[in-house]
């Protein structure tokens, strides 16, 4: 055969040896990619896996190579479906939109955002309220309840206030949900010396960071069939918000760093306490 194609036998044998040789480094990379993909509950794409490979394993790898490794393993990231935004029916001219989409802030505890979403647990809808610090998009408070009332959003605010060591002068921004315009919630803001801001009616982009948080939670983490019990929902949501989202999941806003990691890094660089 070699004589027919005028190929030296040494070249043929060298080719056979290369074909039999196992690329151990590639196998290791594929294993790491699989592990990170499984940890993300099949939600991480090539960009997120690149960031996590560097942050967790110190491995610098390009998106193209990660994409190839994912294809070799048959890994396909979840694709989010169409997102339906709720709309308020009554305008609140007494609470202006003071944030006005100025989502980039210069320090922690300058602006917090809040919103409510729903989850299926124990055969019924439960409601999740969360509070996000806009500085690095870190979740600082949350609460879960069977009722989407003022008590729910107040509990999430209380948690954030204690978690962040009782800061003063925070601007709290939300949509025009009745819970955030309630007497109970507004009194709590007054007690905490916080300034209130509300989105314009029916404009989801005025509170876009919260919409993105809930979109990530539902498309990446929450089981498609919901939770068997409310306790299971509490534990799983708590882990995602306070551990995975804050400390592990790469965020594009922070150049691939998780929100809490980015905050600690920025505090060190700027000297913010």
Regions found by a protein language model. Give the residues of each.
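RNase H-like polynucleotidyl transferase catalytic core
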Residues: 1, 79-84, 144, 172-176, ...
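Mobile genetic element proteins and their domesticated derivatives, centered on retroelements
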Residues: 1-5, 12, 33, 49, ...
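Basic, flexible linker segments flanking DNA-binding modules
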Residues: 2, 9-107, 203, 258-267
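Conserved, non-catalytic sequence blocks in retroelement Pol enzymes and Pol-derived host proteins
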Residues: 21-22, 39-42, 56-59, 103-105, ...
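RNase H-like two-metal-ion nuclease catalytic core shared by retroviral integrases
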Residues: 88-90, 174-176, 180-185, 198-218, ...
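An active-site-proximal beta-strand-loop segment
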Residues: 101, 105-140, 146-147
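Active-site beta-loop-alpha junctions of metal-dependent nucleic acid enzymes
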Residues: 124, 143-165, 171, 181
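C-terminal domain-tail junction helix/linker
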Residues: 190-194, 216-273
């Amino acid at each position: 055969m070699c004589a027919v194609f005028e190929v030296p036998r040494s070249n043929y044998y060298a080719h056979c040896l290369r074909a039999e040789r196992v690329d151990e480094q590639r196998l290791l990379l594929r294993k790491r990619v699989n592990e990170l993909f499984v940890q993300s509950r099949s939600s991480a794409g090539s960009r997120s896996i690149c960031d996590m490979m560097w942050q967790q394993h110190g491995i610098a790898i390009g998106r193209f190579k990660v994409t190839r490794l994912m294809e070799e393993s048959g890994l396909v990231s979840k694709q989010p479906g169409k997102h339906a935004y709720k709309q308020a029916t009554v305008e609140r001219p007494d609470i202006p939109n003071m944030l006005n989409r100025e989502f980039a802030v210069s320090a922690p505890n300058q602006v917090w955002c809040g919103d409510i979403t729903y989850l299926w647990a124990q055969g019924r809808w439960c409601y999740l309220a969360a509070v996000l610090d806009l500085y690095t998009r870190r979740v600082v408070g949350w609460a879960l309840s069977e009722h989407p009332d003022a008590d729910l959003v107040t509990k999430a605010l209380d948690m954030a206030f204690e978690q962040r060591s009782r800061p003063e002068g925070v601007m709290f921004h939300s949509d025009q949900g009745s819970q955030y315009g309630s007497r109970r919630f507004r009194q709590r803001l007054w007690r905490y010396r916080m300034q209130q801001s509300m989105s314009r009616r029916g404009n989801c982009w005025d509170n876009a960071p919260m919409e993105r948080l809930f979109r990530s939670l539902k498309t990446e983490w929450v089981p498609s069939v919901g939770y068997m019990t409310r306790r299971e929902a509490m534990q799983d949501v708590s882990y995602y918000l306070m551990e995975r989202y804050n400390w592990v999941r790469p965020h594009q806003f922070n150049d691939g760093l998780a929100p809490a990691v980015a905050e600690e890094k920025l505090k060190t660089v700027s000297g913010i306490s």
